[in-house]
């Protein structure tokens, strides 16, 4: 198999890796209970989505 003929510089390596970072989680507050949840998903604490109760959540007390 062919091998690289010339060595790549640190700048070229870093330019290639510029898009390899992780993006932070975009959590938003639930309008019903106020706890943080992922957007476009059912709240795991109160079970609501877009103002409607979708799932029944048992209290973890």
Curated annotation (Swiss-Prot):
A GO CC term attached to the entry: large ribosomal subunit
GO molecular function, one term: structural constituent of ribosome
InterPro entries xrefs: Ribosomal_bL32, Ribosomal_bL32_bact, Ribosomal_zn-bd
Entry-linked Gene3D superfamilies: Single helix bin
Pfam family, one: Ribosomal_L32p
GO biological process: translation
Matching HAMAP family: Ribosomal_bL32
Protein name as annotated: Large ribosomal subunit protein bL32
Organism, as annotated: Syntrophus aciditrophicus (strain SB)
């Amino acid at each position: 198999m062919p091998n690289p003929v010339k060595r790549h510089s640190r700048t070229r390596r870093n330019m290639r890796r510029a898009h390899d970072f992780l993006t932070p989680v975009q959590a938003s507050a639930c309008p019903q209970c106020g706890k943080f949840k992922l957007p476009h998903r059912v709240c795991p604490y109160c079970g609501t989505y877009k103002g409607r109760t979708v799932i029944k959540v048992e209290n973890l007390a």
